[in-house]
Design a protein with these regions (language model features):
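Long, charged low-complexity segments
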Residues: 47, 52-119
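Hydrophobic alpha-helical packing segments in soluble, helical-rich domains
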Residues: 31-49
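Charged alpha-helical initiation segments
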Residues: 1-27
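Amphipathic, well-ordered alpha-helical segments in soluble domains
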Residues: 11-15, 41, 79
Length: 119
């Protein structure tokens, strides 16, 4: 890994670890937020090597935009969709999900050297 990619990996997985702690404490909402932030870090790094993509500045906008990008594998787009589904008044999405697993899937895809086209 390049030093900057190493840093992105460390920061993204720090968010996943924070999410695991939140989930362990029963706070699945915070776990989802941490997963999205970790994804945002990885996607932001990837976007540096894909300047043609205009996916916005926030993790939510990046996750939303990637859902419609057919050049991204369906399993990654599906994981992004699950992470951006709105919760109901009980803070539930109505689908079975593991936001941390979805986050890890997205992070691994966007930090995989084969997907980076590093300049």
């Amino acid at each position: 890994m390049t030093p900057i990619r190493d840093l992105a990996h460390i920061k993204a997985y720090a968010e996943i670890r924070a999410g695991q702690e939140a989930k362990k404490n029963g706070n699945i909402g915070k776990a989802r937020v941490c997963a999205r932030r970790g994804c945002g870090i990885a996607i932001e790094y990837w976007l540096q090597n894909h300047p043609e993509k205009d996916w916005g500045e926030s993790a939510i906008s990046m996750l939303t935009k990637l859902q419609g990008d057919q050049s991204i594998p369906k399993n990654i787009r599906d994981a992004a969709e699950r992470l951006t589904i709105k919760v109901d008044q009980n803070f539930e999405t109505g689908i079975e999900e593991d936001p941390l697993r979805d986050g890890e899937t997205i992070i691994e895809y966007f930090l995989n050297k084969n997907n980076l086209n590093e300049m």
